């Protein structure tokens, strides 16, 4: 605290990519909806995004000045955080940007977070990605997608019904 005003330190990191370009990860503090096109890649219904966007911390990853990925993280309990949305533009997928963003989150929340959660559909694409990032199965919410979305959600040709939660113990 400085006087009676709380101080919040905002920072960005920069790292070199394999192409020798600078990768930057920065918080988004205002006008988060400017990234709606990217957010909708991970969560197809805007009304669902509205449930967590303003209460969550948002980050964008850019390389060479061009946005590649974004994520939104919410605090669910004192030491439990959840990745609510993580998306990479299709032309940049499978190039390590999502994993870099998750690794950044692990460092960013270290010391404040005991458990990091991520919820996803029962997808043959998403679950192996999160497992590769160190997450393990936690639990599932049956019929989450069919009960909460106004249209069927498909990924890799499969209709998503249950929300599958994975967790990572941050003490490991």
Placement of each model-derived feature along the sequence:
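Short hydrophobic/aromatic beta-strand or adjacent loop that forms the aromatic wall/cage
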Residues: 56, 160-165
């Amino acid at each position: 605290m400085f006087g009676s005003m709380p101080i919040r330190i905002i920072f960005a990191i920069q790292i070199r990519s394999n192409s020798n370009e600078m990768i930057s990860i920065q918080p988004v503090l205002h006008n988060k909806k400017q990234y709606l096109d990217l957010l909708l890649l991970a969560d197809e219904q805007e009304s669902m995004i509205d449930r967590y966007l303003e209460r969550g911390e948002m980050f964008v990853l850019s390389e060479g000045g061009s946005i590649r990925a974004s994520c939104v993280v919410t605090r669910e309990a004192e030491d439990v955080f959840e990745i609510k949305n993580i998306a990479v533009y299709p032309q940049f997928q499978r190039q390590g940007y999502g994993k870099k963003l998750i690794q950044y989150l692990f460092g960013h929340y270290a010391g404040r977070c005991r458990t990091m959660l991520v919820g996803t559909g029962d997808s043959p694409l998403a679950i192996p990605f999160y497992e590769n990032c160190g997450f393990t199965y936690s639990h599932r919410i049956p019929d989450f997608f069919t009960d909460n979305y106004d249209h069927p959600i498909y990924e890799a040709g499969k209709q998503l019904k249950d929300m599958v939660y994975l967790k990572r113990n941050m003490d490991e």
